Regions:
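PLP-dependent enzyme catalytic core of the Aspartate aminotransferase-like
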Residues: 95-102, 109-144
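A short linear hydrophobic-aromatic micro-motif
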Residues: 64-68, 102-107
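Short beta-strand-to-loop capping motifs
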Residues: 82-86, 121-123
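Non-transmembrane alpha-helical segments in soluble domains
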Residues: 26-29, 54, 81, 93, ...
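Soluble or luminal CAZymes and related metallo-dependent hydrolases
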Residues: 17, 38, 45-49, 88, ...
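Conserved glycine-rich beta-strand-loop-beta hairpin in the small C-terminal domain of fold type I
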Residues: 39-54, 64-83
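Conserved core segment of the aminotransferase class I/II
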Residues: 1-44
Length: 144
């Protein structure tokens, strides 16, 4: 875990970055370690929203592309991956865009699975979840 944090996460977000953001990031890490900042509380909103969004897709014929990490179920978080039977990622994205839903295809993320999309949770506010549900339902009914 240590090398992954240092060599993969820390390096990627700080290498080539100006000094001020590095100091800001260091201050956040210090506050977390000192118990002054509860980052879990802040990011738990993404998990709650992802759970609702995932269910909207699943209730309308979509499937999760990545639902497990080895033998453990994936937690809900910043994004999740979905597919729709019989459609490539590009076909699905093209269709969903016509319903006002954007995403990115899995092949652009480096995934070995290409029949699916990555759905970002951060841009979907609670106020927009009803719109998402109605648009996904419209899409689903059009596929029948």
């Amino acid at each position: 875990f240590g090398p992954a944090i240092l060599q993969d996460a820390m390096y990627c977000i700080s290498a080539g970055t100006a000094h001020t953001p590095q100091l800001g990031f260091a201050a956040i890490l210090k506050a977390v370690n000192d118990g002054d900042y509860d980052f879990v509380e802040v990011v738990s909103e993404y998990g709650r929203r992802a759970k609702v969004m995932k269910q909207i897709f699943l209730d309308n014929g979509f499937q999760l592309v990545y639902d497990r990490d080895e033998d453990q179920e994936l937690a809900d978080g910043f994004y999740f991956t979905i597919s729709y039977p019989g459609m490539s990622g590009e076909e699905l994205l093209s269709e969903l865009i016509s319903y006002g839903i954007s995403a990115i295809t899995l092949d652009t993320t480096g995934s070995t699975r290409h029949a699916g999309l990555r759905i970002c949770v951060s841009h979907a506010t609670d106020e927009r979840l009803a719109d998402l549900k109605s648009r996904i339902q419209l899409f689903s009914h059009a596929q029948i």
